[in-house]
Curated annotation (Swiss-Prot):
<feature type="binding site">
    <location>
        <position position="1211"/>
    </location>
    <ligand>
        <name>ATP 2</name>
    </ligand>
</feature>
<feature type="binding site">
    <location>
        <position position="306"/>
    </location>
    <ligand>
        <name>L-glutamine</name>
    </ligand>
</feature>
<feature type="binding site">
    <location>
        <position position="1264"/>
    </location>
    <ligand>
        <name>Mn(2+) 4</name>
    </ligand>
</feature>
<feature type="binding site">
    <location>
        <position position="1264"/>
    </location>
    <ligand>
        <name>Mg(2+) 3</name>
    </ligand>
</feature>
<comment type="function">
    <text>Multifunctional protein that encodes the first 2 enzymatic activities of the de novo pyrimidine pathway: carbamoylphosphate synthetase (CPSase; EC 6.3.5.5) and aspartate transcarbamylase (ATCase; EC 2.1.3.2). The CPSase-function is accomplished in 2 steps, by a glutamine-dependent amidotransferase activity (GATase) that binds and cleaves glutamine to produce ammonia, followed by an ammonium-dependent carbamoyl phosphate synthetase, which reacts with the ammonia, hydrogencarbonate and ATP to form carbamoyl phosphate.</text>
</comment>
<dbReference type="Pfam" id="PF02142">
    <property type="entry name" value="MGS"/>
</dbReference>
<feature type="binding site">
    <location>
        <position position="1179"/>
    </location>
    <ligand>
        <name>ATP 2</name>
    </ligand>
</feature>
<dbReference type="GO" id="GO:0006207">
    <property type="term" value="P:'de novo' pyrimidine nucleobase biosynthetic process"/>
</dbReference>
<feature type="binding site">
    <location>
        <position position="713"/>
    </location>
    <ligand>
        <name>ATP 1</name>
    </ligand>
</feature>
<feature type="binding site">
    <location>
        <position position="637"/>
    </location>
    <ligand>
        <name>ATP 1</name>
    </ligand>
</feature>
<feature type="binding site">
    <location>
        <position position="1609"/>
    </location>
    <ligand>
        <name>L-aspartate</name>
    </ligand>
</feature>
<dbReference type="GO" id="GO:0005524">
    <property type="term" value="F:ATP binding"/>
</dbReference>
<comment type="pathway">
    <text>Pyrimidine metabolism; UMP biosynthesis via de novo pathway; (S)-dihydroorotate from bicarbonate: step 1/3.</text>
</comment>
<feature type="binding site">
    <location>
        <position position="1754"/>
    </location>
    <ligand>
        <name>L-aspartate</name>
    </ligand>
</feature>
<feature type="binding site">
    <location>
        <position position="1252"/>
    </location>
    <ligand>
        <name>Mn(2+) 3</name>
    </ligand>
</feature>
<feature type="binding site">
    <location>
        <position position="727"/>
    </location>
    <ligand>
        <name>Mg(2+) 2</name>
    </ligand>
</feature>
<dbReference type="GO" id="GO:0005737">
    <property type="term" value="C:cytoplasm"/>
</dbReference>
Length: 1832
């Protein structure tokens, strides 16, 4: 079998000259091709891999790598260039400062990708390639280094050779490599095994040389000379020398074979080095002699350790593939502590051969191999790892101190030479005694409550992990978390869940009630921490132990002053700052801090009054402004433009520390890290930068005493190594959720275990199952996190980003290159983003946008690059690191080049397509460049064999096998990591959290996955949101951390050969691609996507509701302002304006007047230009009701009804829900259930669905129906104790389940769900409720009645029950009247009431005591006792009830009203605010009833259970077939017979037919009936579809072949018809003569259906064409039809044109060759109807751009008098992807078929191509026609 050859796995560097290919051949015959970037020569050596993520300059100069070909597993190499070779070391004087020796020692370098000349670091003087060429070292990139690592891991270290491409043999497309027989193209050389040589002799010093320390620090011998270490150089790294010299000893470095017995020295050190210790007999003899003499202490490292062991008499062994990395855990046998070490070796000491007197000092925590030895009673020891690091962590550098101290002591006290070395850190026994396991039986975990900005789904993930960890340890867990939408509050996780506020009062109550032993405050974000801080002094008295990080540590990290002092005490620095209350004080403060500074007004919200000052003048100016707004200013050192770097650090109770992940913000300091793009691991830090910050992080966490996990953020000056600590979060944070997902290391799970006192080294790594958790993950991919903002939902919120967080969600993407990862992330944020390319959106000026970043920043960079800005110019404006900008510039340039090509240019260039995919461009983006469409590009790609590879995330960069299936897709690879045998069910997750789609859908996805797994199905999860539980690697059998779009889902589906795709659980994101998936041949599980489309397209849905007799509010679609105006006058204001297909009411608005209408239309039309705007009559004061249901095959099998507290008009996502409903009348409930049954049946739902109703005076109307799981599913499932998602999943998969199961909850009792808003985070947003959704989360609680439940739920959102003062401002008279009894109640309860002018008058008239407050301007301060603003600002008000009148549920207009100002003040000063009258009433009643709340079980509760649904839907086929209508027993000869009502009936029946066929129902409507088909012209489709239609209806068919019939004998048509009428009940006739219809009408006794009379008409084709348009586009009205081709003889066109006259707003464009125009009488028909828009002989882009339906016809040879005339026009029009680039993205391409050349085959793959679906619609239509004509 031929060995495998792999083509290059990544794209070549753009704009760099190609240096030729290199082929890396392995001993086993496999060959990897890549691009050369080092010296142009071939070499051979031993292949080894190294898993460190930084430190390539140090690694390649490490003598231990002599003769080896080094494979770096981290894919991005060369990012920070190479520092100067000339700079000399301060300590070592004549040696280079930045390297480990004076030359590169590796034989060759292999990497996945390479930065080229786009490196970025202040010390860099050249690229890595330049340096390698200087030194004559070959290098290659473009290799799938992960695949290579796995090969070495499985086979062991092997020989390899890097072979250069021969100069004279050029390769046409280097990126495709040289397939097949590659050898002739490359040079050949012999294999070389470096281990057979004496490598040490090559790298050791040639003559002894003495290095002296600085006299000031020199350590002295008792005799007065310097202490001297003799170093045996067997390949020493310079850093070992640096470690000695800086500690004040002099070092005599001697060659490897030097006999040092005559030298005078105080300690012997044996260095590291390359090769096999077996060949070093001379050195071993010399060391042996020193051991015998025992004159001095001895210390060895790496090879030195092996040589010392051999000298003592032990043996060494070759390891399979060596340990080469920076993350290897070694446990000390003395102290029991585990250290993270840097290693590089292929041999180890065999500990079983150690002679008497020697013992193991360190062992490898992963595989138990030896890592160090020591003599029991002599000062000799050695270690296998590198305590001097470089590259790698510096955690064991203390061993140099141990050695030097031992040497110093032995020079003063000889007897110590008879004792072993003393190591610091105590003994294992002492350490275990000091930090025992915490013994607890019951633990209380605090959750984070409702999701808000800054505290979102990541706490569901981390809390769930923590509970999992506690359960694994057998501990009983109690959780307090009112967030009912989360997985952690589901059954089966915590033993007990309290849906109560996470505040001090309720936590105290729960502790008293439950009496837990311990509490965790670190898994619930800031909410839980604050409670811990408030209760810290009570915990002991309550008998509760705080687990994990001590509360005092948390207080230190939360308080800036304390934290700064604490850091100062260990010599670390924070950002310098000082407060000042005058300009003079500020000027003094600056003397210490230094310019530039940032000035902020203290106590001002949202960064008001802050700015940067570079000099005194600017400072004075800023201070004057800030002091006007605030009594105090904070002056801080400005680090604008510094890099922001984060580390996640973990520490256990025994003081073992690791850093799990480091992250670099793409945006420099100044933007909140939650609003920054974050890249992990860091890309532009060198080894020294990385480990300087890592060491600091470890020191800080140790000093603070954190136990568990903590996050530390730094600012790093990009032009020096100056850094300062910004903050430490001593709890699980957003970053830690990201780090867990980025690395696969389950931080929260581990942190929960550490809090119990379990040490890290005793916890297994769940991914590899063989290594321990005390290690630092190695990544061989790059991760990009990107925030998602929804600022458009709020008026008056600035989109500028700064130090306060505004994003509501985030996405994470994974790739093998930065380009691939960032493009994926951009697409994940929003469906409309295609990737990094210029966007036409309305941005402010590019320069402003770059300087003052907003949520549009990345697009501004793309636009700037497109406009020709250089990287340097953009860097000046943004200070984003040039490395990132260069990568983006590469994408921008590539995109520019691609737009010059078309799809045809690319067809023969698979290398271009491959390169585009490797750079992360998606098919949609390429289609955009090449004027094609997504599916055509996909087809081209599949034909070229270009598909993504699946890679695993395993925490160890492939060093060990992984047992998880945590996967991502990449094109930068050459093989898959996994096999595809499962055929699992794909579940699509929720995607990015945003307003309207949040953690509820994650709950639904996870419940679906768990149900599938419990039922024995293999599962595949697809999601890209790092905050979710569904992206936890142990939830599904396979997790693809990938985007949910058509391309990716199809790729995964086809690779996995999945059983089906379940999209109903993830909210709107998966629903949007359901129909395209179905059309691409995917098995979509659950309700048919065509039915989903029926529910989401308002025309189809509305027609369906009319058909089944369910009411809906009056609405109309809108194309012009005048139409809209007329409609609004007809139905009367108010009305609701909204675009179709939106999530959570984007740009929906209630409109109260014509002026409003005009301004809103503009706004709504912008939202989604492809979908028209719709106006609906808005019903005031109606109740809104939510129905959540599950159906199977259209039959409802379970449902729950919840009622909204607020009236309709508040978005359902912002409404307060009550379950079971308390105020609904039985008749209303019955009507709702009846309507639900009808809708479920009409849509043939299988799975979950949700309907929103409004009810007024018992009349119900449907607002909308979502055929998917909805936001309220978790709430209703948990309140009622029936998991609707489990039921829905079983229904979808055809598993058995119980319909309407018994409800599992205490009798009585009410659940209330309340929205959680984040207005306080969004400076400027108006906190009123409207039709646009504004809440970011939800909470729920239970109570005896709705009042108790509501109050608890409200308190869960942070609401504080008022103590004394309540302020009222009520707008409308109606609200004043409605509120009066409630206000009276407040007064009776003893509250002091304040009110604004109108409200105060009204209340005084009704004898309610109230104090009047006025909204005063700033200058009227003297009247402060009447000033409302003063009362709010001084926190004198405990509750503000502000019921605005004019805005009536809509976002306010642009003037700033006083009401808005006071509402905003309430939010800014954290005063509870109520803005809805219904909320205000229920709140007052709740306060009156429940001043004090006790907790306990709910023993008694409400009285009625949901009604069982029964009975059938009343509308049936029989019903419409039995009514009188025009088709019954009648001929169907011409379309002119029919009215719009007839068509409506026909299509309604066709819909029913379609449902029946899809359900697989057997129909017998025409059983016993007979149809004859009589075709005098050829026909496949028409005859076959009539035959199929008849048979599906249960009838029989006689088909007459006219060429074999009596016609041949001269029988007339009338005789044939009469004859057939004797046998059949109806006849389908096609005849070349136009007059045949008259004959039929005159002579046939049974109905005749015209299937084409000459070139005149084809009615049934026209019917099915119209039906197709309705189904594809929702409606026929208002569409533009373009007919192309032979219009003269195209009979379907003639019929269709006649039918179009029934529809308003239709326009027609005619395109035909000369001589084939539409017949005059048909054309007249169009002119008369006013429908003719234009006529043309060419299909121009303008015509195409207006087209909604493109109807093509065949130029028919049989219609022409001569062959010549036919040939002249036959190829006039051809529709292909190139033509379609001008077409709308939502339109339909139709053709009556068969086709010749009119439509290219490539178009078949376009979603818009409807012609094959047209045939299917034709079947339903003809079934309907036959049923109507022949039944009854």
């Amino acid at each position: 079998m031929a060995a495998t050859v792999y083509r290059p796995a990544t794209a070549p560097i753009a704009d760099a000259p190609c240096e030729g290919l290199v082929c890396l051949e392995l001993e086993d015959g496999s060959a990897y091709q890549g691009y050369s970037f080092g010296a142009p020569k071939s070499i051979a050596g031993e292949l080894v891999f190294q898993t460190g993520m930084v430190g390539y300059p140090e690694s390649v100069t490490d003598p231990s790598y002599r003769g080896q070909i080094l494979v770096i597993t981290f894919p991005l190499v060369g990012n920070y260039g190479v520092p100067s070779r000339e700079t000399v070391d301060d300590l070592l004087k004549d040696l280079p400062a930045h390297f480990e020796s004076n030359q590169i020692h590796i034989a060759g370098l292999v990497t996945a990708s390479y930065a080229g000349e786009d490196f970025s670091h202040f010390l860099a003087t050249s690229s890595l390639g330049t340096w390698l060429k200087e030194q004559g070292i070959p290098a290659m990139y473009g290799v799938d280094t992960r695949a290579l690592t796995k090969r070495i891991r499985e086979k062991g270290s092997m020989l390899g050779r890097m072979l250069l491409q021969k100069e004279d043999l050029a390769v046409s497309a280097p990126s495709l490599g040289v397939p097949g027989d590659w050898k002739p193209h490359f040079e050949t050389i012999e294999w070389v095994n470096p281990n057979e040589k004496n490598l040490v002799a090559e790298v050791s010093i040639k003559e002894p040389k003495l290095y002296k320390p600085d006299e000031a620090t020199a350590l002295k011998h008792p005799s007065g000379r310097n202490l001297r270490i003799l170093c045996l150089d067997v390949g020493m790294k310079y850093n070992q020398l640096r470690c000695f010299i800086k500690r004040g000893v002099e070092v005599l470095v001697c060659p490897w074979d030097y006999d040092f017995s005559k030298e005078e020295y105080d300690g012997l050190f044996i260095s590291n080095g390359p090769g096999d210790p077996k060949v070093m007999d001379t050195t071993v003899e010399h060391i042996s002699a020193a051991l015998q003499k025992n004159n001095t202490p001895i210390f060895g490292i790496c090879l030195g350790h092996q040589l010392l062991a051999r000298a003592a008499g032990a043996k060494t062994v070759k390891l399979k593939f060596g340990n080469r990395g920076h993350n290897i855990p070694c446990t000390s046998m003395v102290t029991g502590k585990c250290h993270i070490t840097s290693q590089n070796h292929g041999y180890a000491v065999d500990a079983t051969t150690l002679p008497t007197g020697w013992q193991e000092l360190f062992i490898n925590a992963n595989d138990g191999s030896n890592e160090g030895i020591m003599h029991v009673d002599r000062p000799h020891f050695s270690v296998q790892f590198h305590p001097e690091s470089t590259p790698g962590p510096r955690d064991t550098e203390f061993l140099f101190d141990v050695f030097i101290q031992t040497v110093a002591k032995c020079t003063t006290d000889n007897t110590l030479l008879q004792k072993g070395v003393e190591f610091p850190g105590g003994t294992t026994e002492e350490n275990e005694r000091l930090h025992p396991r915490v013994d607890v039986k019951k633990v209380l975990v605090l959750g984070s409550g409702g999701l808000s900005i800054g505290q979102a789904g990541e706490f569901d993930y981390s809390g769930s992990q923590a509970i999992k960890a506690l359960k694994e340890e057998g501990i009983y867990t109690v959780l307090i978390n009112p967030n009912i939408a989360t997985i952690q509050t589901s059954k089966g996780l915590a033993d007990k869940v309290y849906f109560l506020p996470v505040n001090a009062e309720f936590v105290r109550k729960v502790i008293k009630y439950e009496q837990p032993d311990a509490i965790y405050c670190t898994f619930g974000g800031q909410t839980a921490l604050s409670v811990g801080i408030q209760l810290k002094d009570e915990f002991e008295a309550l008998g509760v132990k705080v687990l994990g990080t001590p509360i005092d540590t948390i207080i230190t990290t939360e308080d800036r002053e304390l934290f700064a002092r604490s850091m100062e005490s260990i010599g670390e620095k924070c950002a310098k700052s000082a407060s000042a209350s005058s300009v003079e004080e500020a000027l003094n403060a600056v003397k210490d801090i230094g310019y530039p500074v940032i000035v902020r007004a203290a106590y001002a919200l949202g960064g008001l009054g802050s700015g940067f000052a570079n000099n005194e003048a600017e400072l004075v100016d800023l201070c004057n402004k800030a002091l006007a707004a605030s009594p105090q200013v904070l002056v801080e050192r400005s680090m604008k433009g510094w890099k922001e770097i984060e580390y996640e650090v973990v520490r256990d109770a025994q003081d073992n520390c690791i850093t799990v992940c480091n992250m670099e913000n793409f945006d420099p300091l100044g933007i909140h890290t939650g609003d920054s793009i974050v890249v992990a691991p860091s890309q532009t830090l060198s080894d020294e930068d990385y480990n300087m910050l890592r060491t600091t992080a470890v020191n800080v966490i140790r000093h603070l005493g954190v136990v568990g996990e903590c996050n530390i953020q730094y600012a790093l000056n990009p032009f020096s190594r100056e850094y300062c600590i910004i903050e430490v979060n001593a709890r699980l944070s957003r970053s830690s959720a990201l780090a867990s997902k980025a690395t696969g290391y389950p931080l929260a799970f581990i942190a929960a275990k550490l809090g119990l006192g379990i040490p890290l080294k005793e916890i297994k790594n769940t991914v590899t199952k063989v290594t321990c958790a005390c290690f630092e993950p190695s990544l061989d991919y790059v991760v990009v996190k990107m925030p998602r903002w929804d600022l458009k939902k709020f008026t008056r919120v600035s989109t500028q980003l700064g130090s306060s967080m505004k994003s509501v969600g985030e996405v994470m993407s994974i790739g093998r290159t930065f380009e691939e990862a960032i493009q994926k992330a951009i697409r994940a944020i929003d469906f409309h983003n295609l990737g990094f390319s210029e966007s036409k959106g309305a941005l402010m000026s590019v320069d402003d946008e770059l300087q003052t970043p907003s949520d549009q920043r990345l697009f501004a960079i793309a636009n700037a690059m497109h406009a020709g800005y250089t990287v340097d110019r953009i860097w000046e404006l943004t200070k984003i690191d040039k490395w990132f900008l260069s990568k983006l510039k590469g994408l921008s340039n590539f995109a520019k080049d691609m737009t010059k090509l078309t799809a045809n240019d690319v067809v023969g260039r698979p290398d271009l397509l491959l390169r585009a995919k490797q750079l992360g461009f998606c098919d949609r983006q390429l289609a955009n460049f090449w004027d094609s469409n997504e599916l055509a590009i996909r087809r081209m790609r599949l034909e070229a064999g270009i598909t993504p590879f699946v890679k695993q995330i395993d925490t160890v960069a492939a060093e060990f096998p992984a047992f998880t299936n945590y996967l991502y897709l990449t094109y930068n690879a050459s093989e898959h990591d996994v096999s595809f045998e499962d055929r699992g069910v794909m579940v699509l997750g929720s995607g990015v959290y945003r307003i309207g789609s949040s953690v509820e859908f994650d709950w639904c996805s996870v419940r679906a996955i768990r149900t599938l797994r419990e039922s024995g199905f293999k599962t595949i999860m697809v999601n890209y949101n790092p905050e979710t539980v569904s992206t936890d690697y142990d939830e599904a059998d396979k997790l693809y951390f990938e985007n949910i779009n058509l391309e990716t889902v199809l790729d995964v589906y086809q690779m996995e050969d999945a059983t089906g795709v379940l999209g109903a659980m993830g909210g709107q994101t998966p629903n949007n691609i359901a129909l395209p998936l179905l059309r691409a041949g995917v098995r979509v599980l659950g309700t048919s996507p065509e039915m989903i489309d029926t529910a989401e397209n308002r025309y189809k849905f509305s027609r369906m509701l009319d058909r089944i007799g369910v009411d809906q509010p009056t609405w109309k679609e809108l194309t012009s302002f005048d139409e809209a105006k007329a409609f609004c006058q007809k139905v009367s204001y108010p009305v609701l304006v909204r675009p179709s297909y939106v999530l959570s009411g984007a740009a929906m608005n209630t409109v109260y007047s014509e002026a409003d209408l005009e301004s809103y239309l503009q706004q709504a039309a912008d939202v989604s230009p492809e979908h028209p705007v719709v106006i609906t009559k808005y019903i005031e004061n109606a109740k809104e009701i939510e129905m959540d249901a599950v159906a199977k095959d259209g039959k409802v099998v379970g449902h729950f009804i919840s009622e909204h507290v607020e009236n309709a008009g508040v978005h359902s996502g912002d409404a307060t829900l009550i379950l079971p409903p308390q105020d609904l009348e039985q008749t209303t409930i019955q009507r709702i259930e009846e309507a639900t049954r009808k809708i479920g049946a009409a849509l043939n739902v299988t799975g979950p669905f949700n309907i929103q109703f409004i009810a007024k005076d018992n009349d119900i109307k449907v607002i909308e129906c979502n055929v998917r799981a909805s936001r309220s599913f978790p709430f209703v499932s948990k309140v009622m104790g029936v998991d609707l998602i489990e039921m829905a999943t079983k229904a979808i998969m055809g598993l058995p389940f119980v319909e309407y199961p018994a409800i599992d909850r205490p009798s009585g009792g009410v659940g209330v769900k309340v929205p959680q808003f984040s207005f306080s985070r969004l400076s400027g947003a108006d906190p009123v409720l409207g039709v646009e959704m504004a809440s970011t989360g939800e909470v729920a609680s239970f109570g005896v009645d709705k009042y108790e439940a509501y109050l608890k739920a409200l308190m869960s959102t942070g609401f504080k029950v008022p103590k004394k003062n309540i302020l009222l401002s009520i707008g409308s008279y109606k609200d004043k009247k409605e509120m009066l009894p409630s206000v009276a109640k407040l007064s009776q309860m003893g509250y002091k009431l304040f009110a604004t002018a109108g409200t105060a008058d009204f209340l005084q008239e009704h004898d309610i005591p109230v104090q009047f407050l006025e909204v005063l301007a700033k200058e009227d301060d003297q009247k402060s006792e009447y000033s409302l603003t003063q009362h709010l600002a001084n926190n004198m008000i405990d509750l503000y009830i502000n019921l605005p009148s004019n805005n009536r549920y809509r976002r306010p207009a642009n003037y700033i009203s006083k009401g808005y100002q006071t509402r905003r003040m309430a939010v800014d000063y954290q005063i509870p605010l109520v803005t809805n009258v219904k909320n205000a009433k229920i709140l007052v009643e709740a306060i009156a009833r429940y001043r004090d709340m006790e907790i306990g079980e709910r023993d008694y509760q409400t009285s009625h259970t949901p009604l069982q649904l029964s009975g059938q839907v009343n509308f049936t086929l029989q019903d419409s077939l039995s009514r009188p209508h025009s088709f019954k027993k009648a001929h169907v000869l011409s379309v002119e017979q029919y009215t719009r009502a007839d068509l409506h009936l026909l299509f309604t029946v066709a819909e029913e037919m379609r449902l029946s066929v899809q359900r697989g129902n057997v129909m017998d409507i025409l059983k016993g009936r007979m149809l004859a088909t009589l075709f005098y012209e050829p026909s496949t489709r028409t005859s076959a579809s009539f035959e199929a239609a008849m048979k599906r209806l249960g009838g029989e068919v006689i088909s007459i072949a006219t060429q074999h019939s009596s016609v041949q004998k001269g029988e007339t048509l009338q005789d044939t018809l009469r004859t057939l009428a004797c046998y059949a009940d109806a006849i389908v006739l096609r005849h070349p003569d136009e007059t045949c219809v008259d004959v039929a009408k005159k002579y046939s006794p049974v109905p005749v259906v015209n299937a084409g009379n000459g070139s005149r008409e084809h009615p049934t084709q026209a019917f099915l064409d119209l039906f197709t348009v309705r189904e594809e586009l929702g409606t026929v009205q208002g569409l533009t039809f373009t007919f192309v081709g032979d219009l003269r003889y195209g009979r379907p066109v003639h019929s269709l044109v006649y039918l179009l006259r029934h529809y308003s707003g239709v326009k027609v464009q005619l395109v035909s060759p000369k001589g084939l125009e539409l017949p005059t009488d048909v054309r007249q028909q169009l002119v008369k109807a006013g429908q003719l828009l234009c006529e043309s002989e060419t299909l121009t882009p303008e015509i195409l751009g207006k087209t909604d339906v493109l109807y093509c016809t065949r130029v028919q040879k049989e219609r022409f008098p001569s062959e010549a005339e036919y040939e002249k026009v036959k190829g006039s029009y051809r529709i292909d992807n190139q033509t379609l680039k001008h077409a709308k993205s939502k339109m339909a391409i139709m053709h009556p078929l068969p086709r010749n050349e009119e439509i290219a085959e490539e178009v078949d793959f376009d979603q818009r191509a409807a012609y094959f679906r047209q045939m299917r619609y034709g079947l339903y239509c003809r079934m309907a026609l036959l049923a109507l004509v022949m039944s009854g």
